Structure formats: C-alpha cells, structure tokens
Amino acid sequence: MQRRSPPKHRHDGASPLPLGMDWSPPPRNWNGRDTIWPHDFRTGWSYCVTIPSWTLLSKSKNSDPIVFYRVQVSVQSPEGVSTMRGILRRFNDFVKLLADLKRAFPRKSFPSAPPKGFLRVKSRDMLEERRCSLEDWMTKLLSDIELARSVVVASFLELEATARSACQVVDQNASDSNDDGNSTSLSSLVHPNSGGSSLLSSDYGSDTAYETSELGSASLGQDDVSETDTGDLTLDEDLTNPTEKLVKFSMSNIDEGLSMSQTIIEQLEDFPKHRVHLGYANDITETNSYNGKASKGVFRANNDLRCRSESETSHSVMHDRKLSLESADGVSLLAGETSTSSILSSIVHSQLDVNHDISVGNLEIPGNGRIVLPLKMHSKLNRILLTMNERLLNSKTDMEDLIARLNQETAVKEYLNRKVDDLEVELETTKQRNKENLEQALMTERQSVTKMQWDMEELRQKTFEMELKLKSKEDGSSDSKTSGNSTISESHELLQEMDATKQQLEDLSRRYVELEAKSKADIKVLVREVKSLRRSHMEMEKELTRSLTEKSDTEKLLQQERIIVENTLEARRRLYSDCEILHDRLKVNNTNLSMDESSNNREDLSEVSNALQDQIEAQLLLGFDETASEDELRKIMADMYED
C-alpha cells in the first residue's frame, strides 16, 4: 500500500488531533486567556508545549524522592481564548516517547534526547539544566508537523483531556456572555475532521495530570481536589495511575447512563396518554425543578429535539485515521453522556408552549420533575435513547477490553524487567570471567618477558667482561713492542670471539623466539591431544564398563552351563550303573530260565525288549532333550522292574 505524503502546512484542515488542532511555538509572554500567540488565532485550534518547572515527590517517607517535570500544554481556540493544562512526566517518559516515535517513524531522523547522566545526582543546577534541555528538545521534535500530529505525541501530552478542558472553558465563556443562559454544546466545538478522534490513554509511567485554571490552582484529573501547588500533593493524589482513574470514572458513568436510559425507555413505553390544558402545563413548568434549579424560559420541543439529534449525528462521525478505530467508542461514550445530560437538562430546565387541544404524554424523571412532550415526538426520543443505550453498552465493552489490555501490558513489563535483571547478572559474571582470563594471560607474558630480560642481562655482562679484557690487553701491548704482534693477534682473536659471542647472542635470541613460538604451537597441540585423550579415556572407560558387564554375564552363563553339564553327567552315570545292574540281572534271569518253559514267556520277553528298543528309537527320532530322555528311560526301567 502506498504511503500517504506528509502534510504540507499547519491548519490545513487535515489534522487528526482533537478539535483539528496543530502545534504552534509558545508565546513569549503569558497574559491569561488573552495571551497573544505568534500566529493568527482565526486559522484554527492550536497547542504549544512548555516545561516551566520540576518537582520532587516520594512514594513513602523512607524512599528517595522522584523527579517529575511539569509539562504545560496550552491551547488557543479560534476565538482567541487561551487555556492551560499541566501533566507530570518523568525523564524516562521522554526517553520512551522517543523510542515510540522511532518505532512509528523508522525512516525519519530525530533530534537526540538529553543525556540521562547519573541516577543518584539530583542537584538543582543539573535538574534545571535538564529541564531547559527537555524543553528545547520538545520544541525541535514538535517542529516536524508529521510528529506533532502523531498519535504517540497526542497520547504523551494527553491532548484529548486538554481539548475537553478547553471546550469547557469556552462553553463557560459563552454561557457567561449570553443573557439567556443557553450553554454551547461540546459537539459544536469539535472539528469536522476530528469528530471521531480516539480517546487517548497515557501509558507513560506513574504520571499525574493537573489542570491549571485562571487562578493558577491545580486539580488532579477529573477529581474535585484543588491544590495551590502540585509540589504539596500527597502520594495517593499525585502518583495514582491516570489510566486507572479514567477507567473507573468512565465505567461508573457508563453504568449510570445505562440505568438512566433504561428507566426512561421503560417509562416512555408505559406512561399514560391524556389531554391536558394549557394551565396544567404551565403549572408543571412553573413548579418543575431538577437538581435544585427551577425551570425558566419557553422552548419548542420540535426544535430542541432536532437540535439534539443533529448534535448526536455530529458526535457519531468516525474519523478514518489509522489506530483510532480501537478507541472510537470512547468518543461515543463521551458524546452519549454529553448528549444525554444536555437533552435532559434542556427538557427539564425549559417550559412547554403547547396549545389546549394537543395530546401530550406524562413522564416522571429523577428530581421530582415531569416532562411534557407532544405525542408525535415519543418515537424520536425513544430511538435517540435506544441509540445512546447501545453506545453506552459498546463503550462499556471497549472499556473492559482496555482494562484487560492494560493488565496484559503490565504483566509483559514485569516479565521484561525480570529478564533485564537476569541479563545484567549474566553480563557481570561474563565480565568477571573475562577479566580473570586476561589477568592470567598478562601474568604469563610478564614472566616470559622477565626471563628474556634476565638472559639479555647475562649476555651483556659477558660482553662487558670481554671488552674489559680486550682493553686491558691493548693497554699492556703498548708497554712492550716485542709482544705487539702477539697482542694484535690476541686482540684480533678477542674481537673475533666478541663477534662470535654477538652472533651467538643473536642466534640465541632468534632461537628463543622460535622456541617460544614452537612452545605455543606445542601447547596447542598438547591441549588438543589432552582433550582427545580425555574423550578417548571416557570412551575406554565406558567400553571397559560394558566389557566387565558382559564378562560377568558370560561368567554367570558359563557357571549355569557347568552346573547343567555336571548334572547331566551325574544323571548319565546313574543311568549307566542302572543299565549295568539291569544287564546283570537279565543275564542271571536268562541262565535261570529253564528250557521247558513255555514259548509264550520267551515271546513276551522278546516283545518287551522290542518295545523298549522301539520306544528309545522313537524318542531319539523326535529329538527330546537328554534330561527328558533319561527320565523316560528311568520310567521304562521301573516298569520293567515291576513286570
């Protein structure tokens, strides 16, 4: 999707901010409502941002104070009326604002934020310097028209609440200037392009909003508590989350609006219809009161309802800017509450001008008053109240969604804080470990350098001794001319020895470097070999354990086999002895048999022996095990003994 081009100039009617306002440089001198701004106020609504002061607030008696900067948001209406509203912001909130803007506009370059500095240092000079830096930084930031119109800046400055307070001041001025006491509706002041502006909720820490009136008193948010200075606020009044206060206030107003609209709808459907006279209507309007104020003036019901319907229509316009859809029902909530209060107040505080023959309805409302309406206006009022009821229900649902989203964001923030703490601990541990490793490496290098210096010192000492010997020999050669040749030869030899020593020194130094490099390489190789040996040692230990386990299992099996073989041999020995005994007995029986015995007995013996052989052969063919065969043979022999 093609991105829209940035706006060309300010007050072009395309600002998505509440009331279609645009940023303007702050005026140099403040003169209350009649302050002169550096532009033509007839071009539209304008706002400016200044940071006039800072304050120190503490959460408890024993805790350290927290620095809050007073951000003053001033608004000028097209009539030239200036209003101011202040909010408290911490330095971290400005840093978060810059981070949110960078995420929203990744291709845009931003002015650098003031440095954070030391957390514990909170001198007045440093805080005053930071206040000035923050004010200049905000001016540079808002000089960009695209940033000044962004949702992030509107949420940070709470322009929605500032616009509401400005509208209230303008309404108050209009009501004071009009003699008939008719107040201007909030919807008539809303810019056409910002009718559906989203209800922006601030999420910049524990900040507190204060509204500055003409007298300079500050009031916290929507509360009725008034203080002469925000520095004297208590903890509960100053550090309460403005989002939670806004949620509670909106939910209570939604519930009240729902109950009121439901009651009016039920009474509109069920109230009796009759004809009244003009005198009775005048008596009602004269004695009718609401919230302790008597009704005055005469109005036309048709004109009032038409005016309120148009006001409802203007409040239901939804803006098409991105990121405003989620909170569009919040504006409907505000519009519904304003329209409801304006309709009821205008109906109750006005008199009816009806004829004697008009059929009217009777409706009782809170405040011991009655509404007298023409019969044909009942359906219109019923539709208006149903629409307001639906808007209130939608607003209540959206408020519950906002509460759930706020709780979710709080949980995510706590999780990220814990994650950051863990990462900080891990970073400190890593730094300590790296520091220890570096110190150990430096110690090793220092030892090697010290050793090399000692070697160099020894070589220098030897060289110096040889030079002394050479000089002494040269001095002795001048005394004797006869030994000159020998001295010269000795000096040459000494020079040669010195050159050889120098060469040897160079060789030793070069060899030392080579040995050092080789030792490092050998150390690396040894480290790798040690690691491989450790791995192989572990593998060998595992294999040895496995071999020992297999050996023990094999020994157990071998022992079992030996026991089985011994049992088999013993059984065979017994069988063999039984067979010998049987054979001997058969021989004795054969010799004792007489020749005259009947042939039948011989045939029986031969049949028994044949049956025995057949049974043995059958068992061998079937492949029984030896133990079963021996048991069977014993059984057969027992049968033979019995026979």
UniProtKB/Swiss-Prot annotation:
Mutant phenotype after disruption: No visible phenotype under normal growth conditions.
Bilayer topology term: Peripheral membrane protein
InterPro entries membership: EREX-like, PX_dom, PX_dom_sf
UniProt GO cellular component terms: cytoplasm; cytosol; endosome membrane
GO BP terms: protein transport
Composition bias type Low complexity, residue spans: 194-207
SMART domains: PX
One of the record's GO molecular function terms: phosphatidylinositol binding
Residue ranges, annotated region (Disordered): 1-26, 172-239
Composition-biased stretches (Acidic residues): 224-239
Superkingdom, taxonomy of origin: Eukaryota
Compartments where located: Cytoplasm, Cytosol; Endosome membrane
Record SUPFAM superfamilies: PX domain
Ranges of Polar residues composition bias in the record: 172-191, 209-220
Presence of keyword Protein transport: yes
Keywords, alphabetical: Coiled coil, Cytoplasm, Endosome, Lipid-binding, Membrane, Protein transport, Transport
Pfam families hit by this protein: PX
Residue ranges of domain PX in the record: 47-164
Coiled-coil ranges per UniProt: 389-440, 491-543
Residue ranges, compositional bias (Basic residues): 1-11
Job of this protein: Acts as an effector of RABF2A and RABF2B. Involved in vacuolar transport of storage proteins. Regulates membrane trafficking to protein storage vacuoles (PSVs). Binds specifically to phosphatidylinositol 3-monophosphate (PtdIns3P).
Stated name of the protein: PX domain-containing protein EREL2
